[in-house]
């Protein structure tokens, strides 16, 4: 199995890459420089990959200046559009395109599932809506498309490891009012 993977240095994708390699699957990392290539050249790089996994995107745990909001948006939507364009030009198209998304599409008023369409009306929800729309364009070229709406991802070296020192020093405090959801 040959898999092409964006966001290869990220938290989730670096873990996934190791899982794929342990199964003796060939992993082709798609780096930022590769995304600057023309769609045709990117298609050549990933040609023959049976699965394309798109986990690219700037880290949302930073200060959201107007400039950084643009980076958050472009690193997801532009990357996804470029990948779909490249897949359309591949001589051997992938069977599956898996793209990340986020639970930030939902408002904070209840419990939601994948068939709910009562989305939030904020900047993060706009990013997610546009991101999913860009990913689902792969269906137009007959590629099975799967979108995962990630919430907080917990794992070794992740968010909790960064928060723990403050809590150990007694500076962590209560997070929220205790009634908020955790996804």
Spans of model-derived segments:
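NAD(P)-dependent short-chain dehydrogenase/reductase
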Residues: 125, 139-141, 146-183
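Conserved glycine-rich Rossmann-like NAD(P)H-binding loop of the short-chain dehydrogenase/reductase
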Residues: 26-32
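Catalytic helix-loop patch of NAD(P)-dependent Rossmann-fold dehydrogenases
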Residues: 110-147
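NAD(P)H-binding glycine-rich loop region in Rossmannoid oxidoreductase-like domains
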Residues: 34-82
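N-terminal Rossmann NAD(P)H-binding glycine-rich loop of SDR-like oxidoreductase domains
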Residues: 3-23
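Conserved Rossmann-fold NAD(P)-dependent oxidoreductase catalytic core, especially the SDR/UDP-sugar
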Residues: 81-122
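SDR active-site strand-loop-helix element
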Residues: 6, 52-56, 97-103, 148-150
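Rossmann-fold NAD(P)-dependent oxidoreductase module
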Residues: 15, 19, 86, 134
């Amino acid at each position: 199995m040959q898999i092409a993977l964006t966001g290869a240095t990220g938290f989730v994708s670096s873990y996934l890459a190791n899982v794929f390699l342990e199964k003796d699957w060939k992993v082709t990392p798609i780096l930022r420089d590769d995304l600057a290539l023309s769609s045709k050249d990117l298609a050549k790089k990933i040609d023959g990959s049976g699965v394309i996994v798109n986990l690219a995107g700037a880290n949302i745990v930073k200060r959201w200046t107007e400039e950084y909001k643009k980076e958050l948006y472009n690193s997801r939507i532009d990357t996804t559009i470029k990948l779909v364009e490249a897949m359309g030009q591949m001589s051997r198209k992938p069977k599956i395109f898996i793209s990340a998304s986020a639970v930030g599409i939902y408002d904070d008023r209840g419990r939601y599932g994948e068939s709910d369409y009562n989305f939030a009306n904020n900047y993060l929800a706009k990013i997610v809506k546009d991101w999913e729309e860009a990913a689902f364009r792969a269906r137009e070229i007959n590629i099975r498309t799967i979108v995962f709406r990630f919430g907080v991802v917990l794992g070794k070296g992740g968010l909790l490891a960064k928060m723990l020192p403050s809590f150990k020093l007694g500076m962590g405090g209560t997070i929220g009012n205790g009634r908020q959801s955790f996804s």
